[in-house]
Amino acid sequence: MNRSTGIESCSFTRGLVRGAGGLLLAALGLSPHWAAATAPTVSPPAVPPPLPLSDAAEQLTEIMVEAREPRYVAPTRRDQIGRIWAPVFINGRGPFRLVLDTGASNSGVTAMVALALGIPTDQSPHVMLRGVTGSADVPTIRVDTLSVGDLAVDSPILPIIPDALGGAQGILGSEGLVNKRIFIDFSHDKIAITYSRGERSGHDFVSVPFRSNRGQLIIIDAMVGPVRTKAIIDTGGQTTIGNLALRQALAQHNIGFHGKPDQIQGATLAVESGELIATPPIKFGTIAINDSGVTFADVYIFKHWKMTSEPAIMIGMDALGTLDTLIIDYRRHEMQIRMAKSG
């Protein structure tokens, strides 16, 4: 069965992940053993009391998180598979290791982080946390600031997500990224989040335009073999997942008849059966990602996004991690990609 204000460049760690299962980190109720977890090293000992929730904050009732629970995780600087960890400061404390998740509408943290910040969760407001395999009602905390690089979010409401992140301490979602530029250098394990100045791509980069919905999902037009496909760029997921409409379209071209059974399990413990298939290259712009393995399943999130009638795919870090450099410019609505050199 199957990520202090002013930091502009910082290291990230990727976890090696094998297999196609292990799916969403959306929403498991807190288990009673979380308080025994070891808190990260943080500075000042005194923590101000949590801020009261405003009327607007109380209206927040639903949050999307797309990061998936890994099967196997081992920090590595060599393998191009795994999620991106960004060092994030919360209320000036940290840094905490949050997974950069372009499939998440909001950031979230584990109960261990809430404990380290000294913020109780037992009587906090709840939100509906939605993920790949299901949804659940979870508590929230409100903090003063969340910052990394040029990204600074004031008074964010953070859902408490399960401590099943393979060593990460939460999710860095897309709120606050509307005018930002994310630079990810896989070859040197570097990430920078800065204000976008509308820079054009370099001569050795390929530009791929994207569109986004209200939740800031990154949506591009792609081809999987001969099939036109709507693709979601999902830096929070280790693996690539296709819907059944894409599976059926490939089958019409006699592609993918020799898959093997797979299971997708989210942090809600909901399990959905899937089929792991070696597919033709995934192409977008002039980029081609070869040796693609896609798990096809009728997962909850495709239904929630109303992406069941036409071919759709969530491109995870097993594919994105094969790139040399990935730039996501939210102001330009453009990805700028440099492929890794072969050999």
Across the structure, where does each feature detected by a protein language model lie?
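Bacterial N-terminal signal peptides
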Residues: 19-32
